[in-house]
Amino acid sequence: MAARLCCQLDPSRDVLCLRPVGAESRGRPLSGPLGTLSSPSPSAVPADHGAHLSLRGLPVCAFSSAGPCALRFTSARCMETTVNAHQSLPKVLHKRTLGLPAMSTTDLEAYFKDCVFKDWEELGEEIRLMIFVLGGCRHKLVCAPAPCNFFTSA
């Protein structure tokens, strides 16, 4: 269940969050491989995440204040999420993501280091905002905004 998302860098937490495309944005657009993306400031994301959006194709967790559960990651080399720093990102994605083939945790870690983090380090922040993982999660699609607990097992 993949959805088109835009990147939102939260410098206060050093977290790159992904939001459904169509959210109100005052950020300048960035050209990415899937079209124009936007990089809204944290305050540009409305409090009622998604109430004004077209909901077709979006999982329930797209409206969580933490962002989509499988598509939230940091720029830290240890690849820890800020929500649950005891689990590495590859392990979370391995459990929750449908968009990638089944891989071991080691393979996933190598995949993200090669495809994402290496480019972040070499190309800098401007390019980093355009590099993201477009996968999916196991949450059901919704017809109306609904809360989603980030910690709920999929």
Curated annotation (Swiss-Prot):
Domain of life: Viruses
Post-translational changes noted in the entry: A fraction may be phosphorylated in insect cells and HepG2 cells, a human hepatoblastoma cell line. Phosphorylated in vitro by host protein kinase C or mitogen-activated protein kinase. N-acetylated in insect cells.
GO biological process terms held by the UniProt record: DNA-templated transcription; symbiont-mediated activation of host NF-kappaB cascade; symbiont-mediated arrest of host cell cycle during G2/M transition; viral genome replication
Keyword Transcription regulation: yes
Keyword Transcription regulation belongs to the record: yes
Compartments, record wording: Host cytoplasm; Host nucleus; Host mitochondrion
Region feature Mitochondrial targeting sequence, mapped onto this chain: 68-117
Keywords: Activation of host NF-kappa-B by virus, Activator, Apoptosis, Host cytoplasm, Host G2/M cell cycle arrest by virus, Host mitochondrion, Host nucleus, Host-virus interaction, Modulation of host cell cycle by virus, Transcription, Transcription regulation
GO CC annotations on file: host cell mitochondrion; host cell nucleus
Subunit structure: May form homodimer. May interact with host CEBPA, CFLAR, CREB1, DDB1, E4F1, HBXIP, HSPD1/HSP60, NFKBIA, POLR2E and SMAD4. Interacts with host SMC5-SMC6 complex and induces its degradation. Interacts with host TRPC4AP; leading to prevent ubiquitination of TRPC4AP. Interacts with host PLSCR1; this interaction promotes ubiquitination and degradation of HBx and impairs HBx-mediated cell proliferation.
Family statement: Belongs to the orthohepadnavirus protein X family.
Record function comment: Multifunctional protein that plays a role in silencing host antiviral defenses and promoting viral transcription. Does not seem to be essential for HBV infection. May be directly involved in development of cirrhosis and liver cancer (hepatocellular carcinoma). Most of cytosolic activities involve modulation of cytosolic calcium. The effect on apoptosis is controversial depending on the cell types in which the studies have been conducted. May induce apoptosis by localizing in mitochondria and causing loss of mitochondrial membrane potential.
Name the UniProt record assigns to this protein: Protein X
Gene name tied to this protein: X
